Amino acid sequence: MYKRRTSPKIKRNNIENTIPRVNREYACPAGPCGINYRMSRNPAVAGQFYPGTTKELDRAVRLYTRDAEEKIRAKGIVVPHAGYVYSGGVAGEVFSTVTIPDRSVIFCPNHTGVGAEAAVMSRGAWRMPWGEVPIDGELADRLLAASPLLSEDASAHRGEHSLEVQLPFLRRFREAFRFVPVALGHLSLSDCRALGEAVARIAGEETRPPLLIASSDMSHYEPDGIARKKDGAAIDRMLSLDPEGLFRVVRSERISMCGVIPATVVLFASLALGATSARLVKYSTSGDVSGDRGQVVGYAGLAFL
């Protein structure tokens, strides 16, 4: 059995502090929502980052996805989390390309700074426009027991948008599914390795291995050309299956990749599960939609195979 662990509130890193705190749907907001006494989390960004009604949401998700004739089996994926009008095409293509199992472990950055540094919500469900999506409590318990870095903490997920926006895409290809939400703060490289390898041990023991998902946008508020150059450096490290290189280049080149920690963890886990290659499924920037190339956010979709 695991012991309930708590951690002090985390601070935003210097990169996040350089991002203007405005509610732009092509980037990352911090908004309120609630978790009631039955541990049902209310949506934080329904009607903002994605349509708030089931009918309109289904229409939007179908616009950004397709029924691929052949699917690839991925150990892990990286997908963006902005408003669907900006990053839906990238996220949708990744979810369209890979096989979607009935369970996923989703790692997202903690934009709000609330809660533990590696926070798992292990019970209850997340309310979405179509109904509730249940958390896989058994898998969550096994993950908590496997890594002392993880803490049971629902508060970190209360206002976090970057995991919530992935659920409609999962539902598009798997009507009934469970998931484990994990919000990550500022872990060291060694902690990313330890956590990724612990996750891989648990996932590798499952008869139905979960899909490991890292939620991340790329460069924030850079001119389009600079964003593409910086993002290219990070993408190159991911395509080379080099989590250490990814972690370091994001810092050395000051790439404002908000989900570098989730991506590093999932890359370590995918390697431990036997990944031998990676594929860049799609890349774009917000400028491809808005036409504004002066300040863009980058979106990359990758699969680790």
Task: Give, region by region, the residue ranges found by the protein language model.
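Short, basic/aromatic-enriched C-terminal tail that caps enzymatic domains
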Residues: 281, 286-305
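Short, positively charged and aromatic/hydrophobic N-terminal segments
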Residues: 9, 34-36
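Active-site histidine-anchored catalytic micro-motif
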Residues: 40-268, 272-275, 281-290
